[in-house]
Amino acid sequence: MVTQSTYDELKNKYGTVASWTLWCPAEDTKKSNTENLSVFQNPDLLEKLNAKYVFVALNAANHPNFQTKPAWSCFHSGYRYQNDYKLRAATQGTRFEGAYITDIIKYYVETDSSKVKSAIKKDPEIIVNNLKYFQEELELLKSSNNGMNPVLIALGNDAYNLLNKHITGYTIKNVRHYAGYFSDVWYKQHFVDTLSDI
């Protein structure tokens, strides 16, 4: 569960650059309904949200006009080639359903992770500035987790390496990024195999 005050503050500050691992069920195809945000209108929403885990990707891969997007629409794409459905498959019905999901680099839109790493190397202020936002998110979630640090689950090695380099005092796990060339069934089992100890 997440408190109303935590939810409201996260939504107001980070609703356009983060979300929760909560989706409407698929309908006619595996990719269907990932963009349906009506799940966030559920009157029992706060009970379904989970401050124990935070999924962390590297940076926003698309949506340069993210400020105009509805709250929580990140990681909920309706694009025909999206892979968000794999993350839905891996988390739905598990203890990871309803967890917070965000990017460690929020305001640098780029699909090529090597370019992101190069930009950080050239301008360390990118990571310094973004870490302030990320740490604020973690503190807000901590307040809804009995004062305990949430477990951080990196989505891919790039996010994992940044977390290990810059974040201390947290359990940090690593899973494959959902954009990889594998099925949703494989990805769900990957979660089971990789995250069984948390």
What kind of feature is each model-predicted range?
Residues 163-169:
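Short, aromatic/basic amphipathic alpha-helical patches
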